[in-house]
Amino acid sequence: MSKDTTVSLEQLFKELDEYIINSQFKKAIRVCNKILSVNGNDSEAFQCKVICLMQLSNFTEAIECFKKPEQIQSMQFEYSYCLYSTAKYQEALTQLEKQSSKETKSLELEAQIYYKLENYQKTISIYESLLSKPGYSDSIEFITNLCAVYLDAGKFNECQELLNKNKSQQTKTHELAFNSACLAISKNDTKTAETQLKLAKKICTDSLKKDGFSEEEIKEEQTSIDVQLGYVQQICGNLEKSLEQYQNVLEQQVGDSATLVATNNSISVRSILQSDQWSTQPKEYTHAMDSLKSLLTEAESTRLNSKQKKVINYNLCLLLVQLKKVSQCEELIKTLKSKYGQQQQQVDTSFVEDLDIIQVSLLIKEKKFKDAEKLLLKNNTTTGSIKSQLLLAQIYLLDNNNVAKALNVLEKLDSSVSLRPGIVATKVALYEKSGDLEKAVNSLDDLISIFDKQKKSEKDEEIYVNLLKASGNFKLKHHKYREASDMFDRVLKINPNDLIALPSYIVATSHFDPSLSQKYEGKLPNIKFESKIDIDLIEKYGLTFEKKLNLNEDSNSSSPTTTTTTTTKSTKPTATEVVKIKKSKKKLPKVMKPNYVPDPGRWLPKWQRANAKAARSKKNKDIIKGPQGIASASQTASLFVQESKNTNTNNNNTQSSKSEKPRNIHKKKSKK
């Protein structure tokens, strides 16, 4: 290499050094290209070019730079990171496995690749091995990542222990506060989740403002927090607030994974809030389905994990059911079962079970109850979820009202589920229908005894009181007066002025011990009437129905002929009087003819009616062929008779003029 080239290379490297220090990576790449044009084997220029491209996030262009295996060998970590950034996870993993001795940064990248491949067990094992090394236990970013992996793997206890060890760090970074909120959501602690999310949002705004970020950039960073806040409102039942939260995120058009989740969630919320509008306008369902399909395109699906994709596909199945596209729904269910049914994870089995429930609902609509029962029993026997078992009981009731089989399913439910108020109410109704009142009463008493043992909040106290009232009413209905009075007495001990339990207790005790009913008799409120009551009028109308019944009985027993008797009017009504209610006369139209019989063929055209046909036959009866001017044979005969009379009586008279005689009756006109 000549001296001039060496001097020029030294100058180029000085320029390259300045550009890299000043973070002018595009200019640095141009200098690298100049160096490589002079010396193509310069490893330093090649490495600088790759690093600059990675800094500019041009990972595909960086991968294209690696043309020789020696170049890949010299930069194995960088090459693997570029493959990871372009979503080529399997290639990146194989490249990392080729390394003989892995550095900590390679282990971190490997754990991140396993996380993207949703192999959470290997990710946790790598992170836990790194946790023992110096520097990692104090790293907030590393703790945040490990916490996220614990959440996705379903290891909530380990996540809670990790957060408890780093409580002080939760107020410093919004990512860790966000993960703490996600843990609270998984435990159904919505209040804690909401407070943690609001804390995360505040930390995010404060920290980014200090770093000089604009408001738009801060809002983009907060999209995941806003979507999670909307989800908390959704599971709490505040659908309008959650929809407003989702709409605010969608208006920003960030395009990250949180925005895709907001699109799916907003569709599910709108389908509930606007159900009446959607039922009358099927276009809403089709528009929603198109929006969900756009989320599953190749470009968008890389931002979603498999769990999120399952939820979107499940919502697509529900929309197809609403649109009555049964064949398309069945095809989608088959493809989803073949894709996720082979996996042995608990999430996948529950997802397949949800798909079975959709398929069963389609069979129920077609009244194929036996096929629906077989499908549920095939995959979900007694170990099935609550949804599938309750649906099986519903099928038994729909199929010839088989109460015994439905009760058999409900009785086999787990004790944590079988004593829920809704299921107990269903069992009581079915026991009552089957005539087994003892089991109905026992199931109510078991539920009440559970409430007696546990501590009750204000909401639980209200449920407990309503349960006591329902049990008392049921026992009162079936003449178990002592047991019913005990239920109402317990209600009155909680609230002595309960106006529902008070009269019910008096009614129940009056059947076996009237002295007990007098205990609360004085607490009954006095009835206040706005106006005076006419007792005679009440008695009068009260006896009307009884009198009508007596008259009906007398008419059935006596002969068809009836006799009427007149009685003198008294000032007070007696039992024999019947109050006659005056009925308004029916008003008839003035033009109405009472004896008029309408034509039965009035709905037909006139020429098709029977009377029109008779008139036509009568009219054509006398028509004959003859000369012009003569309508019928009777007319010609009368003319001949008249002529003969005139000739006989007036023989001596002169002939009448030609105008007085019929002209050429039998002559035909001759053609000229």
UniProtKB/Swiss-Prot annotation:
Q: Biological process GO terms, please?
A: SRP-dependent cotranslational protein targeting to membrane
Molecular function GO labels: 7S RNA binding; signal recognition particle binding
Q: What is its main location?
A: cytoplasm
Keyword terms of this UniProt record: Cytoplasm, Endoplasmic reticulum, Repeat, Ribonucleoprotein, RNA-binding, Signal recognition particle, TPR repeat
* Low complexity composition-biased segments: 557-574
Matching PROSITE patterns? TPR, TPR_REGION
The similarity comment for this entry is: Belongs to the SRP72 family.
Q: What is this protein called?
A: Signal recognition particle subunit SRP72
